[in-house]
Amino acid sequence: WRDTMVRLTGNGVYGIQCTFLIDWYFVDRTMISSRDYYPPLSSAPVKGSISQVVNSCISQVVNSSPSSPYPSIMHGYVRALIEAKRYVYIQTPYFMPTESVLVAMKTAAIGGVDVRLMVPRKGDAHVVAWASRTYLREIMEAGVKVYMYSGGFLHSKILVADDSMATCGSTNVDFRSFENNFESNVFFYDADTAVRFRKMFEVDITSSVLLNSLPPERLQVSFFARLWESITRLLAPVM
């Protein structure tokens, strides 16, 4: 099992608290808006840490839900892809992108940006894996490098771009996460944080297989396999 999680301290915690209270209202219909739930930050050291609470970088908590007016997290992914100048690295356990993300990935790669995607070599849902293959072939044809992680089940959900921004959270690169589920991501706009995410991705590459480097005959599938993949792709929005 390979996952990525972050611990947030400082003013960014208020965003997570707000997310929790919004979800609480959705479930219980109890509006909680008291400032008691947003206490002043303490300057004392964090329990279990030798450091004090400091606001060392700019972070943004972004949420998405069925009731959201816009798919905000998806917009964040698309913006990172279209604004990237050097690279965009993405990890996700499930890859069935919306048309907006798919086009943004292909456009960035065709434009010379080093776009890399890492997914698990062995997933936990066979139908999802079948549907993902058609998308993987499509982005590879556009120049996206696709890595299959073999060091365990890859559950990490991150994006890092140009050593300038990164995001981590609960969002998969698929229809349900972007448009239907309750999801939350933290976007970091900080070079040091982005570099840490990039280095983690580069370490994971050592436990991965680059699909683009395999002989063409290894990537060929039968007519019936392609037919089944196409059928499962039609079901991607509800998977």
Which residues does each PLM region occupy?
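Charged, low-complexity intrinsically disordered terminal segments
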Residues: 1-239
